[in-house]
Design a protein with these regions (language model features):
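Extended, low-polarity segments enriched in aliphatic/aromatic residues
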Residues: 1-202
Length: 202
């Protein structure tokens, strides 16, 4: 209650200050950023490479979705699932809120979210084995999310360079996405060059 009262009080104060003029309002915002940091440039939550809890939550929620019905009982039939990723104009950098647009002209689809995300991470220029949520998703034994190995994935594409088994896709050019600042230099595929920017124009 105290925290919510403080937030409401602060908003009222800012509203009153805003009525007094822009310079004072800007001064207060600048002071706030110097104390608390710019929201888009400060890691306040789990969005950094060392977080060892967020990926567990994501996988647990997916286990519940795929293996249990809404009433909490085990599913009698496997959940039918189709993943569609719109990467026509994707986002890179400080996501999911403050992304920079990245035109890629790519749509990815599949019937298993672990496989689709693994392929997407690879196309983006990331090593899925360095992303805990993907690396660990392939290892689950109790209530698994996927019943095959990454090497079993076969990608079908209208681009010859991506129309191949996943094991070969990992050795091909990628889209060269810039990761969130909390993940820079921790997830990139360093051995393969990105596709030149001019080839990504729509």
């Amino acid at each position: 209650k105290f925290q919510s009262r403080m937030i409401v009080g602060f908003k009222k104060c800012l509203t009153a200050v805003g009525g007094c003029g822009g310079p004072l309002s800007r001064l207060l915002l600048k002071a706030g950023k110097s104390i608390f940091g710019d929201t888009s440039r400060v890691v306040r939550s789990g969005n950094w490479y060392g977080n060892d809890t967020a990926w567990r939550m994501v996988l647990d929620l997916n286990k519940c979705l795929f293996h249990f019905a809404g009433n909490g009982k085990p599913r009698t039939k496997p959940l039918k699932y189709c993943t569609l990723v719109d990467g026509i104009i994707a986002g890179e950098g400080d996501g999911p809120v403050a992304v920079d647009a990245k035109p890629c002209g790519v749509v990815v689809a599949g019937f298993n979210p672990v496989a689709v995300d693994t392929v997407c991470a690879t196309l983006m220029g990331f090593d899925y084995r360095k992303l805990p949520v993907l690396k660990e998703a392939w290892k689950i034994e109790n209530y698994p999310l996927v019943n095959y190995c990454p090497e079993d994935i076969v990608c079908k594409s209208n681009l010859q360079q991506w129309d191949r088994p996943f094991s070969q896709l990992q050795e091909r050019e990628h889209l060269g996405f810039r990761p969130h600042f909390g993940w820079v230099n921790h997830i990139e595929r360093s051995n393969i060059d990105p596709i030149p920017e001019k080839q990504l124009e729509l």
